Amino acid sequence: DEPKIECAYRELEEETGYRCENLEYLMSLNTTVAFCDEAIDVFVARNLIPSKQHLNEDEVINVERWSVEDLQELIYTGKMTDAKTVAAIMAYAAKYGKQGK
């Protein structure tokens, strides 16, 4: 199996079109505890370097820049409801504050 950190570096570039100088582990979470044992590891990417996306032909991923405050507002107003995304944003905000690090 591919080490988690190497997978995270690879997935970052493939899906966002960015590389980074370092990744910091933030948290792990289980997606559907009662249904399966799938776990997701969340990392924080720092010092992003533009690269190129390498998407599957059926994938469409648009990358946008958002402040932590704006992301939290989407959560609080019910406009962002994906549980893993909400958990990652709130964990980041709790650890680094609204302005990030």
Q: Model-flagged regions — what are they?
A:
Residues 89:
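C-terminal boundary of histidine-terminating zinc-finger modules
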Residues 1-83:
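Unchanged
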Residues 94-101:
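Generic C-terminal helix-cap and adjacent flexible tail
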